Amino acid sequence: CARYASAKERGTMVSRVLYRPFDTEDFDAIALILQQLWHNNSDNDEYNRLEAACDLAYCLSSSTFSQVAVIDGQARGISLARAGQSSGATVKEHWMDTERALLSQMRELEPDACAEYLSFVRATIRTNNRLLESSPLPHDNEVTLLAVDPDVHGLGVGSVLLDAAVSYLSSRGATRAHLYTDSNCSWKFYELHGFKRTATHRANREERRHDMPRESFLYELDLTA
């Protein structure tokens, strides 16, 4: 889920940016950002909204850290990370239940689109597992999501959010952090922040049929440097 969307800077004027942990009241605003960036394949906007919300619920269920950028009272970006399995079981269950409920609504609204989305998710998980297996990195200490509203791109919000996630992993004793990204995302952003590409997967014809990106990457950051 760690992705950073490239978009043109639009000259947005802001008074100040507040950074704080995720609050459940941020959910709809963050899901809308994910919808704009990655969940807009269907002609049915309501389905796209549900799919983005499902993606966000999944990321929240698998993360132990959150940081949100708030501008003028509105959530405009988020970073999530996972270090171990220390998140409260109640919180994890809440987001897993939310994900299941959203999937049920997706199936009812657009069964074919939902089936294709689940095929994409399974293919992505398989690809990420292969990438990780090709490296000595542990499963934990991952930046699980980075998403910023395109309207505030260029203001440094993504950099602050990424630094917050990395600092959290370091504070939990991690010596290396990793994330997954792909050729559809701004992978150069991570290289500018010290991450190094350690593995690449090129999608085969079947994976491309499920809308997988041409190339998927594993990036690593040395936290001891």
Regions found by a protein language model. Give the residues of each.
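Conserved GNAT acetyl-CoA-binding A-motif
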Residues: 140-141, 169-182
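Conserved acyl-donor/pantetheine-binding loop and adjacent beta-alpha core of acyl/acetyltransferases
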Residues: 85-141, 205-212
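Conserved active-site alpha-helix within GNAT-family acetyltransferase domains
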Residues: 159, 183-200
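A short, internal acetyl-CoA/4′-phosphopantetheine-binding micro-motif in the GNAT/acyltransferase core
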Residues: 146-153
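A short beta-loop-alpha structural element at the N-terminal edge
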Residues: 16-32, 83-84
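Active-site rim helix/loop that mediates acceptor-substrate recognition in acyltransferases
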Residues: 44-71, 76, 80, 101-104, ...
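Conserved acetyl-CoA-binding loop-helix of GNAT-fold acetyltransferases
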Residues: 154-167, 192
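Conserved catalytic-core motifs of GNAT/GCN5-like acyltransferases
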Residues: 178-180, 196-213
